């Protein structure tokens, strides 16, 4: 047996022994009728205590004679004869407990406390004081075991090192990893901040179907499910767009939704099949209004959540304080591929030669607009590090966007890039029912030609447009990628609590 295998076998034996010992302790607690009490109530969390009392000297704390009740998980314990120090962790952070034998009811220290294990959940009452080193602590007069942990915590010095285990057992990751806990706190703050921002601008939050008869609103491969009561195959939504615009037709002129989308596609550091989007629709507005809104949203969130408009991402400082850059798709191609002759982007054969020269195979169904878009994605996208809006997307790749009045080959659309990746997509909405019907037919033709991400024909949506959609602009922002930026995370799995994983066999 190799040394590595021997160590692995020893670890399994140690774990089994640990589990056996802890289960025996739980059995003893059951016999005493105190296994899982539910009558302890705390009055503070650790962060509340630190915020209110860290600035006070010990003499002041003694004079105030403040008694508090806290609860949390025992992360460390230092037993020094008749007294011990415990680190208790709760939702707000950590607080130190000072546990002395003679300050607790008889028998609690030796017969109970010393037999408890790291990972157990405790309730503690006592008075605040500061140690000689100035650490805010609680001098315990009551200490109770609230939940017996049967499994040990990850090694306190190394935490949960296996990256895959962090995702599969997120609860252990959250217990042992401060950075991970902070990431999801920031995520919650972002969601709350977006909602407040939208409400302040007069938007109404709505909910639209997660299961749809026709998957629409984006070019993607859907998940299929079956509705037993209706005996009907349905699709998990790939986007809420068409339902939200139906609401604008109905008179709700400013709507937004934050919810999950599902796309049956690949998994990568940037993609998870189940992801969170915020989509909004605003009547009597165009894509330029949404450029302003997007810029203001990111600047506001950065200031409110991080306290500054400069965000560190990897080795780069992203500046949300200054005006965001704005380039047309063709300008971006020229900027990052200077040898490009702009006239070549107006000619199918010339553009095809360019895209093939950079290693992209041209499908038979592609027109000039798709080819130019592929060139942009290959030569420019990765360079868009600072916040940048790219405009003038071809109509061919924008089946739901309004054509430009001057040049009908392009649309009044933008995509928003930060850190070399798309974060948002917005455009003036197509509200010409006949034009929309034709574009749906074009998408059906592309699907028949083998493009399994092309859109279905949605007759009811066309009917809704025939009743009249006001001039409207719409925007979608990827929440997961936004959280990645604000938390300096470099894989989408780090910002999704339970990312998609292949089951363990």
UniProtKB/Swiss-Prot annotation:
Enzyme Commission number(s) of this protein: 6.1.1.6
GO molecular function: ATP binding; lysine-tRNA ligase activity; magnesium ion binding; tRNA binding
Pfam families: tRNA-synt_2 (PF00152), tRNA_anti-codon (PF01336)
Main location group: cytoplasm
Residues the record lists as binding Mg(2+) 1: 415, 422
Compartments where located: Cytoplasm
Cofactor binding, per record: Binds 3 Mg(2+) ions per subunit.
Alphabetical keyword list: Aminoacyl-tRNA synthetase, ATP-binding, Cytoplasm, Ligase, Magnesium, Metal-binding, Nucleotide-binding, Protein biosynthesis
One biological process term in Gene Ontology: lysyl-tRNA aminoacylation
InterPro entries per record: Aa-tRNA-synt_II, aa-tRNA-synth_II, aa-tRNA-synth_II/BPL/LPL, Lys-tRNA-ligase_II, Lys-tRNA-ligase_II_bac/euk, Lys-tRNA-ligase_II_N, Lys-tRNA-synth_II_C, NA-bd_OB-fold
Cofactors (names): Mg(2+)
Keyword Protease annotated: no
Residue positions binding Mg(2+) 2: 422
Reaction(s) the record says it catalyses: tRNA(Lys) + L-lysine + ATP = L-lysyl-tRNA(Lys) + AMP + diphosphate
Cellular component annotations (GO), alphabetically ordered: cytosol
Keyword Nucleotidyltransferase in annotation: no
Quaternary structure and partners: Homodimer.
HAMAP family per record: Lys_tRNA_synth_class2
Sequence similarity: Belongs to the class-II aminoacyl-tRNA synthetase family.
Identification of the protein by name: Lysine--tRNA ligase
Species assigned in the record: Escherichia coli O157:H7
């Amino acid at each position: 047996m190799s040394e590595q295998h021997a160590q692995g076998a020893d670890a399994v034996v140690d774990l089994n022994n640990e589990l056996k010992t802890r289960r025996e302790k739980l059995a003893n607690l059951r016999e005493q009728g105190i296994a899982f009490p539910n009558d302890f109530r705390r009055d503070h969390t650790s962060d509340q205590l630190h915020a209110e009392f860290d600035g006070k000297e010990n003499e002041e704390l003694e004079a105030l004679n403040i008694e508090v009740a806290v609860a949390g998980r025992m992360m460390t314990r230092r037993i020094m004869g008749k007294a011990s120090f415990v680190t208790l962790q709760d939702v707000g952070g950590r607080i130190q407990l000072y546990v002395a034998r003679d300050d607790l009811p008889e028998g609690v220290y030796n017969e109970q406390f010393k037999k408890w294990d790291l990972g157990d959940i405790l309730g503690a009452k006592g008075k605040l004081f500061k140690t000689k080193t100035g650490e805010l602590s609680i001098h315990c007069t009551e200490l109770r075991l609230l939940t017996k942990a049967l499994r040990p915590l990850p090694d306190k010095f190394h935490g949960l090192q296996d990256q895959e285990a962090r995702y599969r057992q997120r609860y252990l990751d959250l217990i042992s990893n401060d950075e991970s806990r902070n990431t999801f706190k920031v995520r919650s703050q972002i969601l709350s901040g977006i909602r407040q921002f939208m409400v302040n601008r007069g938007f109404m939050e709505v909910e639209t179907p997660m299961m749809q008869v026709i998957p629409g609103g984006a070019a993607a491969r859907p998940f299929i499910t079956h509705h037993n009561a209706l005996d009907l195959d349905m699709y998990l939504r790939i986007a809420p767009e068409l339902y939200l615009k139906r609401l604008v037709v109905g008179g709700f002129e400013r709507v937004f939704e934050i919810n999950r989308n599902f796309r049956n596609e690949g998994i990568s550091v940037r993609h998870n099949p189940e992801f969170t989007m915020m989509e909004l629709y605003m009547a009597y507005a165009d894509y330029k209004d949404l450029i302003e809104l997007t810029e203001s949203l990111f600047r506001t969130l950065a200031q409110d959540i991080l306290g500054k408009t400069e965000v560190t991402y990897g080795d780069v400082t992203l500046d949300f304080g200054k005006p965001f850059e704005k380039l047309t798709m063709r300008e971006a191609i020229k900027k990052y591929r200077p040898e490009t002759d702009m006239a070549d982007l107006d000619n199918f054969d010339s553009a095809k030669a360019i895209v093939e020269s950079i290693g992209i195979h041209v499908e038979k169904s592609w027109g000039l607009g798709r080819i130019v878009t592929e060139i942009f994605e290959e030569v420019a996208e990765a360079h868009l590090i600072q916040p940048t809006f790219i405009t003038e997307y071809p109509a061919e790749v924008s089946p739901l966007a309004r054509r430009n009045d001057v040049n009908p080959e392009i649309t009044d659309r933008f995509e928003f890039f930060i850190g070399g990746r798309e974060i948002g997509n917005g455009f003036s909405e197509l509200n010409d029912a006949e034009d929309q019907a034709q574009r749906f037919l074009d998408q059906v033709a592309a699907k028949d030609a083998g493009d399994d991400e092309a859109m279905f024909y949605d007759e009811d949506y066309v009917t809704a447009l025939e009743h009249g959609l006001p001039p409207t602009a719409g925007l979608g922002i990827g929440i997961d990628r936004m959280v990645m930026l604000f938390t300096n995370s470099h894989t989408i799995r780090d910002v999704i609590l339970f990312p998609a994983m292949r089951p363990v066999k």
